[in-house]
Amino acid sequence: MTTPNFELYGYFRSSCSGRLRIAFHLKSIPYTRHPVNLLKGEQHSDTYKSLNPTNTVPLLVVSNINNTVSPSSASFSIGQSLAALEYLEEALPTNARPLLPPISNPVARAHVRTICNIIACDVQPVTNLKIQKKVKALDGDPTVWSRDLATQGFGAVEKLLELSAGRFCVGDEITLADVCLVPAVWAAERVGMDLARFPITKRVFEEMLKEEAVQKAHWQKQEDTPEDLRA
């Protein structure tokens, strides 16, 4: 069986890119990074648009595979972070650390996915750079906007963690819920959200920060992180 090659196009501060960086490091899967500077508009270049028509990051390009979607192509692109995370779970089920509960536990798997989707669908899209620019153009305060919506979203996450948290979001093993949680907290802290309002979320986040994979994936330690922001 051939080993897929992975190329990740992302931005150091993108929480969606951070999810994939954490997953790759947790699974010890090698990948090639391609920085895309969102502030310089590199996501709108013709070159990048040819790879990802949504002009967003991250983009995961997988090559050296049997491409059943487009058989004439030797590579396959995934332009949504949750889809990419699920792909890694399904494409490498036996030789990489699992980030979903066993298939024999569909309830726990659904709970993990619910937490992921609250973060990915209800929190991140309404607080990202694109929306912040729109809010500012309407004479709103993008920081207040982002902080208020992030606080609402994390309130929902906290309620779910009351049901399931052990050492991590769902029990005592790291799952995709934790992978999504960490970059979301990074983003929320940048707009001044008080994480102390959510004690279970705070505890799980701090537990995740102890993981070497999370430390390697931290936005302050990426090759495209500006020198003045590096840790």
Swiss-Prot record:
It catalyses: RX + glutathione = an S-substituted glutathione + a halide anion + H(+). Residues 105-227 form the GST C-terminal domain. The keyword Transferase applies. Pfam families: GST_C, GST_N_2. It is an enzyme of class 2 (transferase). It comes from the Eukaryota. GO terms for biological process: glutathione metabolic process; L-phenylalanine catabolic process. Probable glutathione S-transferase. NCBIfam families: maiA. Homodimer. This is Probable glutathione S-transferase.
